[in-house]
């Protein structure tokens, strides 16, 4: 059921795509009713049968990401929602209470499904979509119902779908029925069946095929519901009608009615009946499905007939049936694929039907019966293609094909249409969508409709031109591709065309795909199905592809593009689970299948999983696209050629591809269509020609990749980990399809089976091989070889097309992908990390998973693997590489093994083409990771795929089975890995690395390392920043980046080297950083090394666990840490943690301090730490402490830990230091340790701290040892309370006087202290008052001066004890080595007034915080000044020791210049560094001081003689505040003066005139002239009263522009007191107006009670000082 649900979710997403289409069709009605994007998509497919409009709409949806970059909302929301949808329903469909359902009218649901489809379409059709979407949400079949709607319109297509469903249902009838029941309930909620029925009836009337399909669909899952909701879905013309529930029997109006039907589908009212009927259908559907799985596909006409009845009933049922069908398909990822295959079978024209299927498939996972109908619909859609609905969804193409294109376009036109639409679609998913969006019957003329897909409008212009013959293009490529674009499956279609039209459609497809992919990951399943569809639609071309695998012979026939052949091929394709499709678009398809599978599972398991898959896929697509984007358009042609070559690699496909480079022959069946369309379109539309060509190129390269991407998206989301791994090669997916057909029961294992099926589907690519290989794994492997070829093609196509597309449409699309994928990625990463952590719990499991992962990575290629992981996090960047999706799986876990295989195979070709681009882009890395040599890669990949066949199984099992299975799979994986490493070393290398990393502690880390290389290669920078995985394996990341970069180049240069690197990476995985470094450098190190490494790691881990039992539980702790730190650390958290714990003894500290920079070193360090677990106790202790400090960051310590975790580290270190300081001995030993660590870890930032600590900590010990011999400089006088004659005079000397720090000395020791300081001998200790405690400060010698260092000894200070001590005045010298150093003042410092108030704060903060700040301060003074500056602001009442030290240093330099009076105040309050100032300003003491300053000025406004009176009385309350503030201002002013060399006249003017203005005039000369104008009344500086008027009221001075700001600051500082005085005057006057009877004191208090006003002044004061500090720094 998980798988079904995944498919359903995919379908829902695809449907949402359709929704977007509909709005463009029928903006008014659809928008409101089609909030469920999915439904809309389906509906569109059905409703827009004749016109390519709907497919175009889908295209818009897909395209819109590019076209409507601004529509990212759809994409992003859709991603999020999509995930939600998947998660909620587990189906990927929305559960009845799913937000999407609830959001019927909201755009979010649409966005959800649309996320994959395209934000533009989504946004357009959100309203419409909501209903449809709601239906989807309520039940998987809902999406299907939408599809049903389409199917209804395409009744003819329905039957084939049903047979397909049947086959699917055979395997999972029970689950399907369950799903159908659910769907039924959902349908009830949404009553879409009625609409579907009406559409069905209409379609039936107009096109028996479509009606049949509809009947078939509704029959399968929504017989009754269909009647209820028939009107809803069916009446294209009667959109309004939909509510009727009465089937609109305007089948003849299929085109129009479909359109209406779509709207009706959207309305939730109609949908509910559909749901109800759905229930009935589910039971029927399974039988039907089982009855005519492939047969019906083949017998599209028969199916049509047989389903005709159903169709009528099942108008609404269609939706549910679609779901049922999907459900049937669901049994395997292929199930999604299957409907597409069915569509393919139904008719190459029926790609749209296929699309429908795709959605159905998606839904099928959830509701087999419903999905079946959808599938059926898909098939019929082909027939109905001409029928309005064919275009609808699955039959966007189908529709075009059937109705519009079917006859004229059927062969050529259809091809063109497909190419066109595909192109238009791929060029800008939106483009295809544009037509669809038109969705008006207009779409019927595919060309226009494509254009109409406004979302793709902008895109459309480019692609639409291609679509200039949209109706035709839509029909041909449309089937798979256009439909994809037109319906929710637009994405899928796009994807499908991509595979089908590897060469010709690929560009469009991929273009579309990328855009759709991001927006409609849900479409991914669609895509997958769509892919099949497209394959089917391009059934000729795709069937050819199939024929490459199983239908290679047929493929050539398909090339003829005969409808029957196409249908037969489609059916065959369906039977083969789109093996042909998988062959050419296997990657796409497999991705799609993967998606369905993954979707289902992920939907069930976690939204994150789903979104992650989606994100990964998106990211991968984005990456690939990016890569492809990187490649110039010129490259696109190369890719196209390459694609053709790739197609030839596919085998028979090659001939066709070569024959029709435009069409891309078999492999590019759709591609050929695309090419034809392109050619035709070019002929038809010269203006479009360039874009079309580009699109064509894109489509060639895009189609496979596009399909892959879409499939990957869906696949990645749901199946990414398990299914993708299993279908590591695209082959797995075809295999799945085949398996689906062959063994529907496999659905029993929703996930494992899916994986197996997917593998079979991939095998289906090498259909014969897959079928021959009974086992999923074997199938996957076999298909792996072929799929690899196809994948290579795909990757090449994708690469080219991705790059072009990325540039053309994916620019906007990428952002969508990025946002979605990023969102999904984070969630998924989180989940996957959790899985990794759990897996890591057992070292063996870890090692196994590592092996598995390594295998997957190997298969995938370093590039793929890295990219996929990165894709997850950085979808946009990684999106380009299709293989990455599979890589993502590998990254997720053992799953990746299969993916790698596929990716490797597929990517190798791309590598050669992409390699060029890879270096420029992310793909660069992925490509590099794959195999640089296309030919060699192909062979290698084929071999690898075969070798991987078993590993994929293992991967699948681990995926499905969980950790246990992972272990088993890992075991197999290890053996397989060797083969992979040998044959496909490049891909294996990554996995190997992963394995080692897992062994080293972590699948997570291995994932990270894999990701990192990809990230480094693909978007090294972005990956690091955006990809949690990358950042997680910070060490690896750093190295991987470099390694990846090198690797990319190396890959391009040496395929073998890359392969070696992969194994190396595995071995390197030991050290998170090492893997990356070794990655590129150690090519020769083989899989064995990594395996041995894993073994060593296991042993070490075991040893560590024995020695440190906490290590076992450490994973839990690390997991918690991971939860705290976030997904970025997830991957590395488990992996790093174990090593981290093991390493802690060694040099873990190094890592946190220098995550990024030390990545290589830290990698080396990590292994060292692992090996060093048995290092000396001292070292272990030291490392332990360091580790504790690093703990917070050790998840992402490699890269992001430094910045993010510095605070945590410091706080931890502070806590440690506080504990350590309990004994002086500890401090000393700590100092020694610090010295050692400093020596050991010189490169780490921490080493700086250690160094500082070491010397400082050693110094304390030195003084004691050397005290007898050494004498400190003598100090004649000591400032002791009651003993000093000079009061309020500058004490002089170094250090900062802090009034709140109260130190005392025993009365009996005073004389001793004086004598000792005078002679330089060791004096008695002094004590710091800490509330009721006294902290002992022992004498030490620092720089020849006598100082006192803090200890952890305390005495009570209360009661009589207070009478035994006298206060001694000290200055804070520094805080080093976690110790506070002070010196006794020779004279009493001036500002003692505030001591009482501050002492309290100081005691608390001094005691508790001093220890904290000192540790951070261990860093070099400069660093400290920087960091403390930031921190100080947070600490309110504590003027941290760091700050004090800085003040000391900075003031010591300027003390001689400043007056003694100002110095002491300024030292504390006006530290030169602005950060210090701000920090200081944030302290309570500073606020109190400033408040006293304001109080004095307020009183001054009321009494002009107040200042003189205070001075006479020597006031110790307000004057000290005044002096402090003025001291700060004067010190800053002096600092400014040193920088601002003013002429005396200007200086005098600035100091005399209180008003200041800058007059700047622009002149023709190079520099603008600047004048300073000063004016205002002079005033007395003491009383602030106006003085005699100046001779001139104002003066102007010309100054350099850069000096004007300095003059402004100087003026503000000089007149600050006066300006505040004026503000106080204003405040007092305002208070007096309100309260005239207040006395002077009351007035002052009233003003000060205005806290906001006072704080505002305080903030501005701090800002002023900060500006000065920044200017002077």
Curated annotation (Swiss-Prot):
InterPro entries named among the record's database cross-references: DNA_MethProtect_Complex (IPR052466), DUF4211 (IPR025451)
Residue stretches of biased makeup (Basic and acidic residues): 1222-1233, 1435-1451
Low complexity bias (residue ranges): 310-322, 411-458, 1452-1462
Stretches for region Disordered: 265-322, 411-543, 872-892, 923-961, 1050-1081, 1149-1182, 1216-1272, 1390-1476
Pfam families named among the record's database cross-references: DUF4211 (PF13926)
Compositional bias (Polar residues): 289-309, 459-539, 947-956, 1259-1272, 1397-1411
Compartment annotation: Chromosome
Function description: Plays an essential role in the protection and maintenance of transcriptional and developmental programs. Protects many bivalent promoters and poised enhancers from hypermethylation, showing a marked preference for these regulatory elements over other types of promoters or enhancers. Mechanistically, cooperates with tet1 and binds to DNA in a common complex to inhibit the binding of dnmt3a/3b and therefore de novo methylation.
PANTHER family with a match to the protein in the record: GLUTAMINE AND SERINE-RICH PROTEIN 1 (PTHR14709:SF2), GLUTAMINE AND SERINE-RICH PROTEIN 1-RELATED (PTHR14709)
Protein name as it appears in the record: Glutamine and serine-rich protein 1
UniProt source species: Xenopus laevis
